[in-house]
Amino acid sequence: YVNYGCSTRKSLYQLVDFFSLFYFRFLRDSSFRNLLYWSKLQRTPRFYAWAGVSFEILAMNHIDQVKQRLGISGVSPQLYSWRSKSDAGAAERAAQIDMVIERGDNTINLCEMKFSESEFAINKDYEKILRNKIVRFMEETKTRKSIQLTFISSYGLQRNMYSGIAQNEVVLNDLF
């Protein structure tokens, strides 16, 4: 993926083949002698890390459906990834945007993608992280375009006092 605001030299490369991702995460170094291997693997940090990356790749592979759900199929969007240029003293301010959709109507969708087994709840701390991502993106890219936070998740957002930070929402069913 081309990094927003950078040349193609600074592109981000990601393994996007689902089987290879699964193989390198779980099969390459494992022993199948343990009959409970797969049962014990579920609900572990290792499993959730793999599921999160796989969900992001799934959403990126279904960008046409994402654009359709957002109602922007006809505004010639460009896709990017983005990572802040964090300096050594500002690690807490570092930010990464899973997918940036730059639209032809002077609007940018900053897409945050999350795998979860139920509705995803944004809490006070996570809202602060999301606001930091938006601010860092605007500061570092110096964009004057309108910014919309788009949340792409398995089952949608749980409505609460913090969920309003997302102007758009895409769920797993929208991808198929």
Tell what function each PLM region has:
Residues G5-F176:
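A cross-kingdom feature that marks ATP-driven nucleic-acid transaction machinery
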Residues Y1-N3:
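Beta-hairpin "wing" of winged helix-turn-helix
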